A protein has these predicted regions:
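Polybasic, low-complexity RNA-engagement segments
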Residues: 1-144
C-alpha cells in the first residue's frame, strides 16, 4: 500500500483506492465481494500493479490515471511512442508538450494521443534531458 500511494503521489494523481487486497505475491487489486476463501483466490477485482523494489503499475491503472486532469503527462508523437514502447528513453525534444508540473526528477505518464503507453522519470542524461523509461506497455510483449 505504501509503494502504491508513493507512486500515485509521484505522478500527481488524486486517486486513492480504498479497499485493497494482497493476493499472489503482492499484487494489489480493488476488491470485489466473492465467497471464495482467501487462500483459493488467484485474482479478485481490478489489477492495479505489483510491489517489487518499487511499485510496478498495471496498464489498467495507467489508463485510469491518464483520465485525470491533475496527473503529470508528457505527450509524444508516433515515432517517439514506438521507441518508448520497445524500452528506449525519450529525449525532451521529442516531447510535443507537457501537462502538469513536470520538473527534473519528477515522474510523468507518457501519452500517445489519449492513451497512456507507460511512465518515466524526467531527468538528465549527459547533457540532454530525457524521460527515462520506468515501465511501458511493451513490457508484456518482451516477457513472452
Amino acid at each position: 500500500m505504501r509503494l502504491l500511494n508513493k507512486f500515485l503521489i509521484q505522478v500527481g494523481s488524486k486517486y486513492r483506492p480504498e479497499e485493497l487486497l494482497n493476493v499472489n505475491n503482492k499484487r494489489f487489486t480493488e476488491t470485489v465481494d466473492v465467497s471464495l476463501p482467501r487462500d483459493m483466490m488467484v485474482y479478485n477485482g481490478l489489477y492495479l500493479g505489483q510491489d517489487k523494489r518499487w511499485f510496478t503499475p498495471s496498464s489498467l491503472l495507467l489508463q485510469k490515471l491518464a483520465q485525470e486532469d491533475a496527473t503529470k503527462k508528457a505527450y509524444v508523437e508516433r515515432d517517439a511512442a514506438w521507441l518508448f514502447v520497445v524500452g528506449k528513453d525519450i529525449f525532451e525534444e521529442n516531447v510535443q508538450r507537457f501537462q502538469g508540473d513536470v520538473k527534473l526528477g519528477s515522474y510523468c505518464l507518457v501519452m500517445f494521443g489519449e492513451g497512456c503507453i507507460g511512465y518515466g522519470r524526467f531527468e538528465t542524461s549527459g547533457d540532454r534531458r530525457v524521460i527515462k523509461n520506468m515501465f511501458d506497455v511493451g513490457d508484456f510483449l518482451r516477457r513472452e
